[in-house]
Amino acid sequence: MRINPGEITKVLEEKIKSFEEKIDLEDTGKVIQVGDGIARVYGLNKVMVSELVEFVETGVKGVAFNLEEDNVGIIVLGEYKDIKEGHTVRRLKRIIEVPVGEELLGRVVNPLGEPLDGKGPINAKNFRPIEIKAPGVIYRKPVDTPLQTGIKAIDSMIPIGRGQRELIIGDRQTGKTAIAIDTIINQKGQGVYCIYVAIGQKKSAIARIIDKLRQYGALEYTTVVVASASDPATLQYIAPYAGCAMGEYFAYSGRDALVVYDDLSKHAVAYRQLSLLMRRPPGREAYPGDIFYLHSRLLERAVRLNDKLGGGSLTALPIVETQANDISAYIPTNVISITDGQIYLEPGLFYAGQRPAINVGLSVSRVGGAAQIKAMKQVAGMLRIELAQYRELETFAQFATELDPATRAQIVRGQRLMELLKQEQYSPMPVEEQVVVIFAGVRGYLDDLPVEAVRRFEKEFLRFMHEKHQDILDDIREKKELTPETEEKLKKAIEEFKAVFRV
């Protein structure tokens, strides 16, 4: 058998021509230092700020946080203990996205959207980046629809509208979370989807909250995002942004959403920790210079969209914890200046048995008044004035021995109104019930009752209204105002009930 050298050459040439090596170019870097939830990486020259990266050997994700001359500071989203010096890091060329949509309702997830409740995987069809630019003025419309909390003191005097940002502020153990949870429970049947973001809390406390939401049937329209105290600071830092993205999905599809951030003090501490580890220069209270921007870019995403964009809304209820009533500290003043009002809870009132312990004098709602229903406006205007006068006279009355009848009458009414504003936890009240009860208080129908009988009067009066005068309640709910005819009927109903009420 003869071998033809020409044929061999031809075959080799064809093989060489058809050979095509696919060169896969990837921007990678090497870990030069790792610890405390951050990694320093050499290389990754083209990486962008906030870009997602992957540690190839472990599969853990990270985010480019600091871009320096000779290295990149990366915050690790998850367990960093398996990452070693020399490991490879590659760019993913996208920013963090979280799953969003109806599939997350009723679920407990971490800030990356991974389930924590043992109910199996979440098959979400939609994803959203956790950081987006807040919509501009042109894309918004004024807040005009109420978000009923079911809490008498708030819905009457510090009303919240859909698309508003209302801060809940106070010392530890004064009932801040209780107000937020009651508000979520009260959204049942209101078409509002809720996101509860727990930042830096004990797992036992979070488990208790989830259990209460389930018990009152609120979990079916709520997503709980958890970055507990035992989670890395990196997850606590991204948690509120992830929760906001989940809420935005509903807002941008023409629906209403409510996001509770519990709480932003711990969020600021987590961000301070990351910034100090990254050697960013510390400022006041050792917080970095951009701590204001951290919260403003989050809370500016609360929005009431105009009709062209579907008219949806995202309402934010951030919570901030104060130390010894100091609302002039750094983080509280920052968040007060960003939000549209604050609900201030006071330990003194809490321990005196006034619960919810809302200081009505220091609390304010800057845009919610426009969203309040007319019926509530009609009765609540009087309530705020009566209580303001009562607060002034109360201190004076402690020292004065003899009071004129007018002053005594104002103090008597003020005491009964304060008693009327007390409310049990987990028992939000429909707005029509609030209107009739407050009407009875401000029109003086409780003045001749002993203070200790006010709560019982309220309970029995509402039962009486449902049994005998349901039409009045229906009328207020449907018309959203107290017409002269309804007012007359209500006065007669109160007098009818007072005739049979036994003190």
From Swiss-Prot:
CDD domains in alphabetical order: ATP-synt_F1_alpha_C (cd18113), ATP-synt_F1_alpha_N (cd18116), F1-ATPase_alpha_CD (cd01132)
Residues where ATP binds: G170, D171, R172, Q173, T174, G175, K176, T177
Site (Required for activity): S363
Alphabetic keyword roster: ATP synthesis, ATP-binding, Cell inner membrane, Cell membrane, CF(1), Hydrogen ion transport, Ion transport, Membrane, Nucleotide-binding, Translocase, Transport
InterPro entries linked to this entry: ATP_synth_asu-like_sf, ATP_synth_asu_C, ATP_synth_asu_C_sf, ATP_synth_F1_a_nt-bd_dom, ATP_synth_F1_asu, ATPase_a/bsu_AS, ATPase_F1/V1/A1_a/bsu_N, ATPase_F1/V1/A1_a/bsu_N_sf
Keyword Transport assigned: yes
Domain of life: Bacteria
Record-level GO cellular component terms: plasma membrane; proton-transporting ATP synthase complex
Stored Pfam families: ATP-synt_ab, ATP-synt_ab_C, ATP-synt_ab_N
Substrates-to-products reaction catalysed: ATP + H2O + 4 H(+)(in) = ADP + phosphate + 5 H(+)(out)
Quaternary context: F-type ATPases have 2 components, CF(1) - the catalytic core - and CF(0) - the membrane proton channel. CF(1) has five subunits: alpha(3), beta(3), gamma(1), delta(1), epsilon(1). CF(0) has three main subunits: a(1), b(2) and c(9-12). The alpha and beta chains form an alternating ring which encloses part of the gamma chain. CF(1) is attached to CF(0) by a central stalk formed by the gamma and epsilon chains, while a peripheral stalk is formed by the delta and b chains.
Function field: Produces ATP from ADP in the presence of a proton gradient across the membrane. The alpha chain is a regulatory subunit.
NCBIfam families in alphabetical order: atpA, PRK13343.1
UniProt-recorded name of the protein: ATP synthase subunit alpha
Species of origin: Thermotoga neapolitana (strain ATCC 49049 / DSM 4359 / NBRC 107923 / NS-E)
